[in-house]
Amino acid sequence: IFRHYDEVISGGGIIYDSDIEKITTDAVHTLDAPFKERLHKELESKNKPFTIAGVLEIAKEKGVLLYPVSFKSILLTLSEETENPRLKGLIRMYNVIGVSLSLGLVKMPPDSLQKTIESIFAKKLEIAKINQVTATYSYNYAAAKFENFDCTLPGTQKESGTLLIQGFQGTALGKMASGCRFQPYYPITPASDESVYLESNEILEIIDDRPGSTAVIQTEDEISAMGMTIGGALTGTRSATCTSGPGFALMTEMLGWAGINEVPIVITNYQRSGPSTGLPTRHGQDDLLFSVYAGAGDFPKIVYASGEIEESFYDTGNCFNYADTFQVPVIHMMDKFHASSVITCQRFEPQKISIDRGKLLENVEDGYRRFEFTEDGISPRSRLGMNNGIFWNTGDESDEQGHITEDPELRVKMMDKRMSRLDLIL
């Protein structure tokens, strides 16, 4: 309430626990000093106490409707009516009370609330029943006693073919549909949720001969995550990692290694506010130019920015196809807003994602050269362990087989070979 009371417009409403009106700003330790100082100035200028009641008085004066209710009294009443003495002490029920009071205020049909509780506590029937009883009582309390609120939220018919999804899930599902089968990562906000989601769905049934399993490994740091991603790609496996700004900064040396060795990988960068640790749980789009110029020296890469969640599912497929076709690292730009937002959209259509592995070889003849000069600058790519497909990788400039060289003419030819694919990409 201290943080958000002034965001409610005239005609809006605030439902609050009447038992907390006397709580002071000093009692809320999550209020940082700069915010508290600004709040105190606001309260002092309006001659209000430094309490919940003080900020609520300001809200009321600008036309906000206040709806006080004692959450403790609701639990006590329910405890007596259901003859369940445990209920009066279950303050965790405050969440259900708050949601139910809100839905009762806007007159939203209660069926969806009851069905949601059933779904969440499907395996805990007793807990589900307690929550449903609490929800019903709280909803009816608000519907009967909260007055003068003009906003209502009538029920709507559920549309067929729709999907409720969070941003990181859209990208993760895009990776599954695109044939990504290996994702090492190091935990970082807000990127970790994608890998955790992939890990929780590691084993999927085979549909239309397209296996759906993705191996997810938590590494010791971002450098290792990038190295393992590259290693996975060298085996011919579609491989990706995900991170945020500080983690991506650590990955840039290995990004250059992938660039000089023409390794197709996808890095999903869930941007947040920097620099350094910056604001780790807040939205930002700070890394675009950094991603474009990431890594020492010049080498081709693709930076692909998604505009919204639904788009990101299909964009992920494009990222993998571009990586394989042009044999370059692809940096898929997302952000905290996309990662955390929840939307309803049309159900994704995985069949719209095609898989193009580019010049990935199934068989290799004698005399294979991994970095062979070709007309389009893109060389046929073998996998680790293929018969006759031996090649060398180093971080140095190399000849067509991968052996280190410092020959100036060969250096120019190799640079031209790599950079020429930018014309194909564009």
Regions found by a protein language model. Give the residues of each.
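Short, glycine-/Ser/Thr-/acidic-enriched flexible segments
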Residues: 1, 20-21, 72, 188-190, ...
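Conserved thiamine diphosphate
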Residues: 59-69, 282-331, 355-363, 418
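Short beta-strand segments
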Residues: 15-17, 67-70, 243, 266-270, ...
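Thiamine diphosphate
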Residues: 112-296, 300-301, 306
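Short acidic, glycine/serine/threonine-rich loops at helix termini
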Residues: 5-7, 25-30, 78-81, 116, ...
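Flexible, low-complexity linker and terminal segments
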Residues: 165, 178, 315, 320-426
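Conserved anion/nucleotide-ligand pocket segment
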Residues: 87-95, 99, 106, 310-313, ...
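Active-site cofactor/cluster-binding pocket
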Residues: 1-178, 182-184
